[in-house]
């Protein structure tokens, strides 16, 4: 896909305490590589990836495919950057809420992140995936799977245990979030009769996307 050659621009925001592995997770997803030497994110950064999304009907794929440009925003987990992070909440259409399986404190802080997310996101029930990262370190694990799944069930969101080091469930977690977002947008399109693809110039596409996003964000 060339620049501007896409049907939808989707912005995802990675949230969680500093050190849970947000940067390495996103790097694994976009580049399929692992770099354990990333320094702590200062402020906010983002990565990009183009993907093809195939719509799913009750009996499987419908054959309709969309070209999606993903912007994956990587936020700083430190308290001093919290106000900067929350400023990006309203622009994001989905959230990767992450904790470190080897840190009980990062798991306990998920509730704080969820409170901030619910207070600042584009709608009351945004699309979220809960991620327990660093699944490749079982000997250092402090959070058991049942704990995490119970929390995910409380918030009615999917849960994945991932590893940026091995790639375990990284793509699956992002694809699940994208699927939730696209289905929400499809429902909004059906209700408002907005064309589900916008042809013409790239600026026309963005106008169409913003219109769909605004109507879906309620």
From Swiss-Prot:
Q: Write out the residue ranges of the motif Effector region.
A: 38-46
The membrane topology term of the UniProt record is: Lipid-anchor
Report the InterPro entries cross-referenced here: P-loop_NTPase, Rab27a/b, Small_GTP-bd, Small_GTPase, Small_GTPase_Rab
Top-level EC class as recorded in UniProt = hydrolase
Q: Quick one: where's the S-geranylgeranyl cysteine lipidation?
A: 216, 218
Residues bearing PTM N-acetylthreonine: 2
**Main location class:** membrane
The record's similarity note reads: Belongs to the small GTPase superfamily. Rab family.
Q: What is this protein called?
A: Ras-related protein Rab-27B
